[in-house]
From Swiss-Prot:
The gene is clpB. It comes from Rhizobium meliloti (strain 1021) (Ensifer meliloti). Pfam families: AAA, AAA_2, AAA_lid_9, Clp_N, ClpB_D2-small. It comes from the Bacteria. This is Chaperone protein ClpB. Residues 768-868 are annotated as: C-terminal.
Length: 868
C-alpha cells in the first residue's frame, strides 16, 4: 500500500479510523473502522452515495456499530494497531478499481466500492444488508464522475460540486419551499428575454437592497417548474451559487480556483441545462485573489463570453458601480435588468400574497388592514430602507410580538395567580396563631382564597381553550398549504386521479374546516387572547423602530395635547402667541393632518435676550418626550465660517472626518422624532442657511456620504435677537404692529427671501412685564427646591420675599436672566453658607422672608430648633 496514491480526504479518513481503533482498545485495524469513519463524515459523501445507490445509510451505520462491538478489546497494550488481512485486501481492491477507471489517486468513492466488493471483509455483508450492491454503487459513481478522472489529491472536491456549492432553486420550488412571488412580472419577463438571447444571455438584476432581486430569481424558478417559460428555458435547473461555501476551507493556493473550475465544468457538461444564479454578484470581483492568483470573475469570463455558462446575477446599485463597472470586460458580458422599488399599492399586493405563509409560521391571523398599514407606515416613517422588505419586516415582527403575547399568561390571570399565592402565604402565617380574631380572619381568608382559586381556574381553562382553538386553525392552515403543494406536484407529474381527490375532496373540506375554526375564534365577545394582527400592532412596531409616536393616542395623551398651552405656560411666562403657534403645530402632527412631506413645524423666535425663546424650546421637548435631552441644540455662533457647514452634514469625500457624518444629520438619523434648535441664527454664516432650504421645504437633507436624512418628524426652531432693540423700546401698552414691521425689516435685511418664505411662522417674543416676574420667580425657585429635595430640605417663600426678588431681578432690557442672578445672590449664596455651617440640617423647613436689603432665612415648623 502506497499512501501517496490516496487522496487527501482518504488519508484523513484512514488517520481518523486508526485513532478510533486505538481509542477503543482494538488490536486490529479493520474495514469496519474505515466504514464507520466514512459514514460519520459531516459532509456525508459516503452516506449520500449509499442513499443514491438505493441503500439505507442509517442501517449501514447500525450494522457497523454492531460489528465493532463484537471486536475484542485489549487494555494496557503498547499503543499500536495492526493492519488486518481483510483491510489490506480492501486497499488492494481500491487501488485496482482506481487504476481500472484511469484515476491517479484512490478517492473516497473507490474506497467505499472496495469495502462493498471485498468479500473477506465484514463490511461487504453490512452494506449488502443495507441494500447496497457493488454494481449499483459503481453506476452511481460513474454518474457523479461524468467521465472525469481523479488526477489530483483534492479530486473529490471536483465531483458533484454543484450539490456542495449550490442550492437547487427549481427543486425547492417543486417542493413548495419558496415563498410566492407576486407582481414583478415585467422584471421576470425581461430576465427571461435576456436568458433567451443567443449571446450575452446573462442578465444581472440591479436594484436597491430590499426591493426583491432574489425574489425575482425565485419567481423565475417557480415559472420554470410551472412550465410558464419559452421552449428554450423549459426543464432547465436554476442553481444558486454559494460563494461562502466555495471559499470556506480553501486553505491552499489554487484550491478555490479548483472548486470553481469544477462547478463550471459540471455546468458545462450539463449542456446548457443549468442556469447559475449568483446573488451578491460583486463578491466575484476579487474573490479568491492572492499574489498572482486569478479572482473568480476572471475564471468566469471565458465561459460567459462563449455562452457555455448561463448566469443570472444580482447586486445593489452601489456595489455594481463600485465593483462590476470597474471591470468593463465583466460588465459587458452581463445585461443589466433594473429592479425598481415597488409602489405602496404593489407592496400591499405582495404582502397579501405572503400573508398565508406568515400566518402559518406565527400561528396568528393577519388582518388586511394591518397589511395596508405596514405598507403605508413603512413608506412614510422608515425612510432609510426600501419596500417591500421593510413592510414585510414590519408584518413579521408585529405577528411575532402578538404570538409572544398569545403564549404569555394574560395580565388579569397573572394578577389573580399572584393574589392567590399571596393569600396562601398569609394563610400559612395565620394557621400558627391561636387567638379567636386570627381564627376568624383565617376562615374569611379561606373563603376568599377558594373563590379566587375558582376564578383563576375558570380563566385558565378559558385561556387554554382559546389558545387551543388558535392552534387548531394554524394546523389546518398548514395541512391546507401542504395539500395545495401536493396538488401542484400531482398536476405536474400527470397523476390526475390524485389531483382530482385533492382539488375536489381534501382541499374544499380543509377550507370549510378552517372557515369554521376562524369563525369560532372571532365568536367570543371579549376574548382573552388577541389572535389578529391589527393596524395598531403595526403602528406600535413602527414607534419602537423609529421613536416616532405613530400608534393610537390614548385618552390621557389626547387630553394632554388639548391642554398643551396650559402645560407650556407653566414653564414659559408671558409669551402666549409663541406657545399657541407651537401647540397648534404639534396637535396638527399628532392628529395626522400635517403635510407628510414637511417638518412638523418650523419657527423663527425673535425677541430680546432672556424672554424665554430657548426656554420654550426646552419646555416643548420636555412636554413631548418627558426629557429635555430630546432636544438637538445647535449653537449657530459655532458656524460663523463658510466651511463650518461641513460640521452639520458631514465632511465631503477626501476630507478628514468623512466617515464620521455630520452633527445634525447623524442625530436626526438616529432619532427622527425630536426638536431641533438652531440658537442665535443671526451669528452663523449666511451660506449655512442654504443647507436648511430643502429641510424646511421638503423635510429632507443629503449628508456628506450621499444618504438622504428624513426631517419630516422633527420640529425646527430657530432663535434670534434681530430687531430686539425695537421690542425692548416697546412700552407695556403700545401697539405692536408698527414694531413688528420694524423688526421684520431687520429680519428681511439679514436673511434671504427664499429662506424666510419656507418658515411656517415668525413669532415675536415680547419683553417681560413687571407683573409677570412673580410667576418666573416661582419657576426658578422650583428648580432650586428640586436640588434641595435630595437633602429633604423644604424651601417656603413668603409673598414679600417673592416681591423682593421680582424687584431686584427685573430689567426690561435683559429679560429673566437678571432674576437668575438675583436668586443666586440673595437665596443660593447665603443659603449655601448656612447649610455648610449646619444651621439647616437635612430634613429642615426653611422660611424665606424679605428684609430691607436682603432676605432672611428662618427654621420653619417641623424643625428641631429655631434659627434666625
Amino acid at each position: 500500500m502506497d499512501i501517496e496514491k490516496y487522496s487527501e480526504r482518504v488519508r484523513g479518513f484512514l488517520q481518523s479510523a486508526q485513532t478510533y481503533a486505538l481509542a477503543e482498545g482494538h488490536q486490529q485495524f479493520t474495514p469496519e473502522h474505515v466504514l464507520k469513519v466514512l459514514l460519520d463524515d459531516d459532509q456525508g459523501m459516503a452516506a449520500s452515495l449509499i442513499e443514491r445507490a438505493g441503500g439505507n445509510a442509517r442501517e449501514a451505520k447500525v450494522g457497523t456499530a454492531a460489528a465493532l462491538a463484537k471486536l475484542p478489546k485489549v487494555t494496557g497494550g503498547n499503543g499500536s494497531v495492526y493492519l488486518s488481512q481483510p483491510l489490506a485486501k480492501v486497499f488492494t481492491a481500491a487501488e485496482d478499481a482506481a487504476k481500472k477507471a484511469g484515476d491517479s489517486f484512490v478517492t473516497v468513492e473507490r474506497l467505499l466500492l472496495a469495502l462493498a466488493i471485498e468479500s473477506s471483509a465484514a463490511t461487504a455483508s453490512i452494506l449488502s444488508k443495507a441494500g447496497v450492491t457493488p454494481t449499483k454503487l459503481n453506476q452511481v459513481i460513474n454518474e457523479i464522475r461524468k467521465g472525469r478522472t481523479a488526477d489530483s489529491a483534492n479530486a473529490e472536491q471536483g465531483f458533484d460540486s454543484l450539490k456542495k456549492y449550490a442550492r437547487d432553486l427549481t427543486a425547492e420550488a417543486r417542493e413548495g419551499k419558496l415563498d410566492p412571488v407576486i407582481g414583478r412580472d415585467d422584471e421576470i419577463r425581461r430576465t427571461i428575454q435576456v436568458l433567451s438571447r443567443r449571446t450575452k444571455n446573462n442578465p444581472v438584476l440591479i436594484g436597491e437592497p430590499g426591493v426583491g432581486k432574489t425574489a425575482i430569481a425565485e419567481g423565475l424558478a417557480l415559472r420554470i417548474v410551472n412550465g410558464d417559460v419559452p421552449e428554450s428555458l423549459k426543464d432547465k435547473r436554476l442553481m444558486a451559487l454559494d460563494m461562502g461555501a466555495l471559499i470556506a476551507g480553501a486553505k491552499f493556493r489554487g484550491e478555490f480556483e479548483e472548486r470553481l473550475k469544477a462547478v463550471l465544468n459540471e455546468v458545462r457538461s450539463e449542456g446548457g441545462e443549468i442556469i447559475l444564479f449568483i446573488d451578491e454578484m460583486h463578491t466575484l470581483v476579487g474573490a479568491g485573489k492572492a499574489d498572482g492568483a486569478m479572482d473568480a470573475s476572471n475564471l468566469l469570463k471565458p465561459a460567459l463570453a462563449r455562452g457555455e455558462l448561463h448566469c443570472v446575477g444580482a447586486t445593489t446599485l452601489d456595489e455594481y458601480r463600485k465593483h462590476v463597472e470597474k471591470d468593463a470586460a465583466l460588465a459587458r458580458r452581463f445585461q443589466p435588468v433594473m429592479v425598481e422599488e415597488p409602489t405602496v399599492e404593489d407592496t400591499i399586493s405582495i404582502l397579501r400574497g405572503l400573508k398565508e405563509k406568515y400566518e402559518q409560521h406565527h400561528k396568528v391571523r393577519i388582518s388586511d388592514s394591518a397589511l395596508v398599514a405596514a405598507a403605508a407606515l413603512s413608506n412614510r416613517y422608515i425612510t432609510d430602507r426600501f419596500l417591500p422588505d421593510k413592510a414585510i419586516d414590519l408584518m413579521d415582527e408585529a405577528a411575532s410580538r402578538l404570538r409572544m403575547q398569545v403564549d404569555s399568561k394574560p395580565e388579569e390571570l397573572d394578577e389573580l395567580d399572584r393574589r392567590v399565592i399571596q393569600l396562601k402565604i398569609e394563610r400559612e402565617a395565620l394557621k400558627k396563631e391561636t387567638d379567636v380574631s386570627s381564627k376568624d380572619r383565617l376562615a374569611k381568608l379561606e373563603l376568599d382564597l377558594s373563590s379566587l382559586e375558582e376564578e383563576a381556574a375558570a380563566l385558565t381553562a378559558r385561556w387554554q381553550a382559546e389558545k387551543q382553538k388558535l392552534g387548531q386553525a394554524a394546523d389546518l392552515k398548514k395541512q391546507l398549504d401542504e395539500a395545495r403543494n401536493e396538488l401542484q406536484i400531482a398536476q405536474r407529474k400527470g397523476e390526475f386521479q390524485r389531483a382530482g381527490e385533492l382539488a375536489y375532496g381534501v382541499i374544499p373540506n380543509l377550507e370549510k374546516e378552517l372557515a369554521e375554526a376562524e369563525s369560532q375564534d372571532g365568536a367570543s365577545a371579549n376574548p382573552m387572547v388577541q389572535e389578529v394582527v391589527t393596524p395598531d400592532n403595526i403602528a406600535h412596531i413602527v414607534s419602537r423602530w423609529t421613536g416616532i409616536p405613530v400608534d393610537k393616542m390614548l385618552e390621557g395623551e389626547r387630553d394632554k395635547l388639548l391642554r398643551m398651552e396650559d402645560e407650556l405656560a407653566k414653564w414659559v411666562v408671558g409669551q402666549g402667541d409663541a406657545v399657541q403657534a407651537v401647540s397648534r403645530a404639534v396637535r396638527r402632527s399628532r392628529a395626522g393632518l400635517q403635510d407628510p412631506n414637511r417638518p412638523i413645524g418650523s419657527f423663527i423666535f425673535l425677541g430680546p435676550t432672556g424672554v424665554g425663546k430657548t426656554e420654550l424650546t426646552k419646555a416643548l421637548a420636555r412636554f413631548l418626550f418627558d426629557d429635555e435631552t430630546a432636544l438637538m441644540r445647535i449653537d449657530m455662533s459655532e458656524y460663523m465660517e463658510k466651511h463650518s457647514v461641513a460640521r452639520l452634514i458631514g465632511a465631503p469625500p477626501g476630507y478628514v472626518g468623512y466617515e464620521e457624518g455630520g452633527a445634525l444629520t447623524e442625530s436626526v438619523r438616529r432619532r427622527p422624532y425630536q426638536v431641533v434648535l438652531f440658537d442665535e441664527i443671526e451669528k452663523a454664516h449666511p451660506d449655512v442657511f442654504n443647507v436648511l432650504l430643502q429641510v424646511l421645504d421638503d423635510g429632507r437633507l443629503t449628508d456628506g456620504q450621499g444618504r438622504t436624512v428624513d426631517f419630516k418628524n422633527t420640529m425646527i426652531i430657530m432663535t434670534s435677537n434681530l430687531g430686539a432693540e425695537y421690542l425692548t423700546a416697546l412700552g407695556e401698552n403700545e401697539d405692536s404692529d408698527a414694531v413688528r414691521d420694524q423688526v421684520m425689516e431687520v429680519v428681511r435685511a439679514a436673511f434671504r427671501p427664499e429662506f424666510l418664505n419656507r418658515v411656517d411662522e415668525i413669532i415675536l417674543f415680547h419683553r417681560l412685564r413687571r407683573s409677570e416676574m412673580g410667576a418666573i420667580v416661582d419657576i426658578q425657585l422650583e428648580r432650586l427646591r428640586k436640588l434641595l429635595s435630595d437633602r429633604k430640605i423644604t424651601l417656603e417663600l413668603e409673598d414679600d420675599a417673592r416681591v423682593f426678588l421680582a424687584d431686584r431681578g427685573y430689567d426690561p432690557a435683559y429679560g429673566a436672566r437678571p432674576l437668575k442672578r438675583a436668586i443666586q445672590k440673595y437665596v443660593q449664596d447665603p443659603l449655601a453658607e448656612k447649610v455648610l455651617q449646619g444651621e439647616f440640617p437635612d430634613g429642615s423647613v426653611i422660611k424665606v422672608v424679605a428684609g430691607s436689603d436682603r432676605l432672611n432665612f428662618k427654621r420653619g415648623a417641623g424643625a428641631n430648633k429655631e434659627a434666625a
